[in-house]
């Protein structure tokens, strides 16, 4: 047998895969003119081809060559005016073999090749070529690549070009490719808030573009310049002599600059989605506060009473604070910070942003809420250079402590009401730093661990004595909550009564559900008018079996309904490996549930003991 063919790909026994041989043989038809029945002429170069192969691979050629038009005549010659011979050679090779080599071609040829893939309807080729172009973007080719990507509505390539230009704005403005941009592509670039070059540089680049493209409407181009961001000197000595903007436009810009708050100006800022920019990598630094070095070091594990955090004293006039200076003006809409959480303390605080350290805009106000541990904060996107966190309360002392700080722009969708997140997903989870601060359980946060299957007479629930205490869940931060869901212990036929209250400070409570006169079993869905909540208190008032209220699972807001899957499971089959510190569902009495017991203790009665 012949050994001339390369190693074949592995195939399963009973399967033959000789696609590579088929590709080689069909591709060989391109080398000579045998069997050719149509000829394309590109830049005076003739390309013999085979109608049936072209038609089989492409709807465009099927219509062209078999649609009854002039091109469908035998031995027809078809001139192509909108491409180059190099790009068409690459396309024919791809049509015949399914292969294309991009690495050795110039950017201009690759863009022509991409245009052909789009025109003739090869979406896979279009995607693959776009992906390769994303990897070779540079200052010299990004503008013409963006022009083509915009023309053919290629979202991934367009996005990558924009990100590259945003991060290299001044170099792009000075490149030759910038002068060759179409008007539409040009405006799409400079109108972006994230195209963060100095406004003077943008104006001068647009001025050069107008000189290079004298036939275009210069007034429309100049409207893209954000004149109020330029200094008075720049307006008078750079903009005014150009003659492209009217004196009224310049005077209006001066008026806006002098009468507006600085933070109301339409600033440009760096945009790096989904990446923390409060790092030394991006030039961020802590400029105010005590123990500055700990805040941005990225260590969220090694901290205690003495080290691993930044701090400031809490005073009544809120003059103290911790201030971070970013490496450059940046667009952010998301902040994550870790409040010191080695005990049960809570904090209150607010966050402000600024461009000049003089005019501050408050983006987060949790000064009237109790918060703990990780804070996941969202707000409308802002351009800022400085971020200030001011603590207003600590439930233990007069010092505000932050272990870690992150800020970024996120594309994650979020809903805000009255400045607070209205979550769609369950935020009463251990991962979201929620905790059970009142109630008795074998495991401190069994109520929040998401396990709705493994519970029985002895484990898997949280409880409190009727008439004494409650079950209280603290969320890490305030949310706008309009629903909760509970799973009441349901291993027998008992029923419960209860009510639910919410609070933001543990002082004032609002009742959101009153089921004290209702017999309730198993899953409970509670909906109410959406309102701020940091604490949820569940108070049992009746149990038909004994004097203890038992809850297996809690979530807020309510998620998709799930039920205990194996309804045939008998009590007593759950995991009993954890040391017990619970109240037995059948026990007639129980110790005070006002706080979590510090150490395990035995069950009070056997599972079968009932109230008499």
UniProtKB/Swiss-Prot annotation:
Highest taxon listed in the record's lineage? Eukaryota
Positions of disulphide bridges: none
Q: What CDD domains does its record include?
A: BACK_BTBD9, BTB_POZ_BTBD9
Record's compositionally biased regions (Low complexity): 589-612
Q: Its Gene Ontology biological processes?
A: adult locomotory behavior; circadian behavior; circadian sleep/wake cycle, non-REM sleep; long-term memory; modulation of chemical synaptic transmission; multicellular organismal-level iron ion homeostasis; regulation of synaptic vesicle endocytosis; sensory perception of temperature stimulus
SUPFAM superfamilies to which the protein is assigned, alphabetical: Galactose-binding domain-like (SSF49785), POZ domain (SSF54695)
Which tissues does the record link to its expression? Detected throughout the gray matter of the spinal cord including the motor neurons (at protein level). In the brain, detected in the neurons of the hippocampus and in the Purkinje cells of the cerebellum (at protein level). Also detected in the terospenial cortex, bed nucleus of the stria terminalis (BST) and the ventrolateral thalamus (VL) (at protein level).
Q: Give the record's GO CC terms.
A: cytoplasm; glutamatergic synapse
> Matching Pfam families, A to Z?
BACK, BTB, F5_F8_type_C
Ranges for domain BTB come to 36-104
Q: Which residues form the BACK domain?
A: 142-240
* Region: Disordered, residue numbers: 559-612
What InterPro entries would the database entry show?
Answer: BACK, BTB/POZ_dom, BTB_POZ_domain_cont_9, BTBD9_BACK-like_dom, FA58C, Galactose-bd-like_sf, SKP1/BTB/POZ_sf
Q: Which PANTHER family match?
A: BTB/POZ DOMAIN-CONTAINING PROTEIN 9 (PTHR46306), BTB_POZ DOMAIN-CONTAINING PROTEIN 9 (PTHR46306:SF1)
> What is the protein name given in its UniProt record?
BTB/POZ domain-containing protein 9
Give the source lineage, highest ranks first.
Eukaryota, Metazoa, Chordata, Craniata, Vertebrata
């Amino acid at each position: 047998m012949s050994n001339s063919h390369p190693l074949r790909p592995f195939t399963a026994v009973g399967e033959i895969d000789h696609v590579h041989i088929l590709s080689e043989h069909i591709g060989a038809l391109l080398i000579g003119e045998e069997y050719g029945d149509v000829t394309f002429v590109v830049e005076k170069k003739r390309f013999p081809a085979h109608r049936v192969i072209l038609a089989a691979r492409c709807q465009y050629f099927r219509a062209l060559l078999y649609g009854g038009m002039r091109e469908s005549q035998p031995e027809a010659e078809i001139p192509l005016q909108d491409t180059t011979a190099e790009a068409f050679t690459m396309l024919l090779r791809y049509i015949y073999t399914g292969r294309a080599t991009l690495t050795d071609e110039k950017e201009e040829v690759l863009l022509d090749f991409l245009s052909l893939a789009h025109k003739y309807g090869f979406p896979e080729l279009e995607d693959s070529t776009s992906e390769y172009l994303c990897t070779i973007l540079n200052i010299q080719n990004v503008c013409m690549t963006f022009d083509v990507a915009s023309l053919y509505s290629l979202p991934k390539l367009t996005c990558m070009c924009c990100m590259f230009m945003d991060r290299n704005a001044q170099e792009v403005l000075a490149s030759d490719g910038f002068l060759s941009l179409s008007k539409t592509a040009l405006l799409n670039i400079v109108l972006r808030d994230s195209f963060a070059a100095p406004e003077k540089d943008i104006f001068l680049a647009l001025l050069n573009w107008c000189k290079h493209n004298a036939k275009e409407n210069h007034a429309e181009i100049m409207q893209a310049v954000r004149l109020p961001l330029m200094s008075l000197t720049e307006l008078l000595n750079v903009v005014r002599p150009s003659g492209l903007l009217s004196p009224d436009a310049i005077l209006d810009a001066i008026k806006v600059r002098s009468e507006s708050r600085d933070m109301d100006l339409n600033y440009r800022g760096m945009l790096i989605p989904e990446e923390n920019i409060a790092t030394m990598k991006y030039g961020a630094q802590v400029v105010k506060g005590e123990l500055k070095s700990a805040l941005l070091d990225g260590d969220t594990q090694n901290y205690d009473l003495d080290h691993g955090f930044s701090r400031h004293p809490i005073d009544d006039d809120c003059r103290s604070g911790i201030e971070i200076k970013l490496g450059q003006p940046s667009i952010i809409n998301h902040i994550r910070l870790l409040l010191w959480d080695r005990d049960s303390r809570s904090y209150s605080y607010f966050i402000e942003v600024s461009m000049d350290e003089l005019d501050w805009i408050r983006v987060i106000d949790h000064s009237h809420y109790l918060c703990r541990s990780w804070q996941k904060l969202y707000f409308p996107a802002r351009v800022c250079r400085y971020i200030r966190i001011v603590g207003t309360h600590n439930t233990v002392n007069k010092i505000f402590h932050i272990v870690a700080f992150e800020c970024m722009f996120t594309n994650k969708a979020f809903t805000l009401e009255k400045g607070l997140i209205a979550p769609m997903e369950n935020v009463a989870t251990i991962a979201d730093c929620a905790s059970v601060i009142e109630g008795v359980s074998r495991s401190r946060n069994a109520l929040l661990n998401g396990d709705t299957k493994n519970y029985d007479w002895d484990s898997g629930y949280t409880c409190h004595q009727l008439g004494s205490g409650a079950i209280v869940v603290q969320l890490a931060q305030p949310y706008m909550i309009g629903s909760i869901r509970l799973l009441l212990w349901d291993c027998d036929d008992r029923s419960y009564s209860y009510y639910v209250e919410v609070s933001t400070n543990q002082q004032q409570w609002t009742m959101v559900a009153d089921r004290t006169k209702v017999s309730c079993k198993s899953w409970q869905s509670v909906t109410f008018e959406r309102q701020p909540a940091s604490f949820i208190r569940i108070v049992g008032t009746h149990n038909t079996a004994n004097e203890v209220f038992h809850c297996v699972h809690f979530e807020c807001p309510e998620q998709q309904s799930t039920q205990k899957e194996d309804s045939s499971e008998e009590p007593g089959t759950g995991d009993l490996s954890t040391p017990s510190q619970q109240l037995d569902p059948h026990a007639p009495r129980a110790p005070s549930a006002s706080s979590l017991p510090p150490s395990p203790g035995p069950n009070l009665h056997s599972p079968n003991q009932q109230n008499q």
